[in-house]
């Protein structure tokens, strides 16, 4: 058949979860539609409502020291360690919502690095604070300095613009005025007209309030003895709140600039501000908790909260009136969003919990897997003690205020929950057949089983398994699907898996019986191991359970893989052959067709797949524990292997057995188990790929890497096959059409189609036929006026393509005359400006217009020189003939005399 094409396996990048924040400043616009974050030297703009990437602004080669957004979202200001300050104008595209950032200006803001920025509410003024203690105020639009303030010569740690409230003078106008009242009226008049102030906090604990109109310091507030990190002003309360690393929170009267309240927070405070029209004050710091205070009394309204881990400590915070949340930045680069409470809720206020988390970076992705029956969540082990659950559902994200509702659908890549319980880094995980149960193993020498009830927003630890002496490098749950009529099949949430297998760096494997009821929190006894076996001579890297739940395999750094009986814990076979440690092992799935080996088809117990540090993958026969085939192609260790799903076709002979592998070379490969060849190589990572998993229905491959990215690869094999068949069919139709035009003598249509199909041989044949026609048209340059018209109406792409062909033909003396004739036709058909201004995509290197014309000129000069030499030689022949004619009379006379 014409459309029968060889089957080709292809995968394309469908989604990528990338890091957006690696520490530093965070900024938001008033509508919470633009989130600006620091990613090393670059700035990232993201829509926090749907996680969409809006723009990436490349840096100047130095790390960013701080950045900010104007409240209106019109400008982005970036300061780097190179001492430069760049101001970008932001314009949102109406088509896809992305943002185009245009560099408005670059200036040297200070003689030392700028570490803090602030913008006023009108988005017109910018304040910059340097490490030398100086503060400058800039006009953002014009780009010049309006004010320069110098206080103490220590680092500026906080800046905040505010406007003092204009006080009413009505009472003062009634009756007799005292001198104090007159002074107050004069101050009120100034405040009503020139009310801009700038509060500046320094590393020495002092806070200065600068009057922008008078260009002087109106208050010097001394209460803190360490860095001032939080500054905010409330017009309703006429108060300024300051917070510092001296573990105190201070409220100041904005009229007299005297202290109203000082509260010890007993933690390093990194963020503070007013909420609910200043009636409440929030603070957050090293303990990682959001705390709410009554502004009037200074009393804490939130209940006492236990300090969180060091990684969950708060590094900075952000809130302004109108925002639907308080944004707190954690030390581990997570952005936690909290709902701001109201004072009316003070009596029932509980410990605040974030309603949404945005992971700035997932760090190294050590392991991952799909969760839930619909596989709408992915569990990530991310070089931390918590397991992150991320949404991968394709639901359309909502915009506006509804995006922050608790019942709004999570967008692709949104953090849904954290599984908190381990004390050390989680290094392995496994998921059962239903997707509701996940087992984790960590460096705290324990394994945990988690129950995932996403519908009810419940993610709880079901049981903890303690007994290993060292880190757990491998955990495995049974993958077999229970019988249709069983309770485990109909209600998997209330029927945990029957057992768990764990492997540790203590070189032992353990089988655990999973309790039918959840362990109580704080329960110390835990579950007991059914058996413990000394399994290997080195660390155990991976464990996998056979789909029948009768066998399990353990892979170790001792270069071997052992097959065990689940029931007795006895070794059934040992797989030897790898030259380095084995990182991954996977049994073949159920109902897999037979694999063709050297000794015929492999049936019976099936096969097992292993990936090793020796850069190879091996396929083993479980019947006799021999190697069927070795797969080579990775240039570094093979860290993970996983089987792809079988096609749905009923014909077993047509089912392709494929698997995927992830390597330390940063590549993901898809292999054909029967041919031993790599079907395709997937490249989207910059570091080693530790984890890979396959969607059980659509064959989507998800890979996690040390570069903090998670890539989702969509299987496009059927689309590629259909497109290739369609392209082949179209090519055949066009070739037949070309033959028909040539046969009919329709040179105009034939040349146009030959150019379109890029058939240089047929194009040359056509032009040769035109030039050698027996009845050329009078006045035609090429030989036929129809061809002249075709050559005179070509697009830029077609002209460039034809010039490429003329360049090639011109190098051969046999085809050069055709090239010269067509070149003449082109030159006479278009002005010189047409050739100099050709707009052609991809015309680079040897195919650039300059190089093409140069090659044509060089060979044309060579042909011209050869023609000149032929002309000169023709004169010599003519001269010789003339001389011979001059000798003819003498020869005739000699003949007569001889006669």
Regions found by a protein language model. Name each.
Residues 38-40, 79-82, 128-132, 200-204, ...:
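Conserved strand-to-loop turn within each blade of WD40 beta-propeller repeats
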Residues 25-32, 67-73, 111, 116-124, ...:
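Loop/turn segments within WD40 beta-propeller blades
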Residues 15-22, 58-64, 107-114, 149-156, ...:
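WD40/WD-repeat beta-propeller blade N-cap
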Residues 43-47, 85-90, 135-139, 207-211, ...:
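WD40-repeat beta-propellers
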Residues 1-55, 66, 75-87, 91-97, ...:
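Intrinsically disordered, low-complexity acidic/Ser/Thr/Pro-rich linker and tail segments
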Residues 690-721:
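Blade-level signature of beta-propeller repeat domains, shared across WD40, Kelch, NHL, RCC1
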Residues 52-55, 96, 102-105, 144-147, ...:
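A structural motif specific to WD40 beta-propellers
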Residues 779-899:
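Extended acidic/polar alpha-helical scaffold segments
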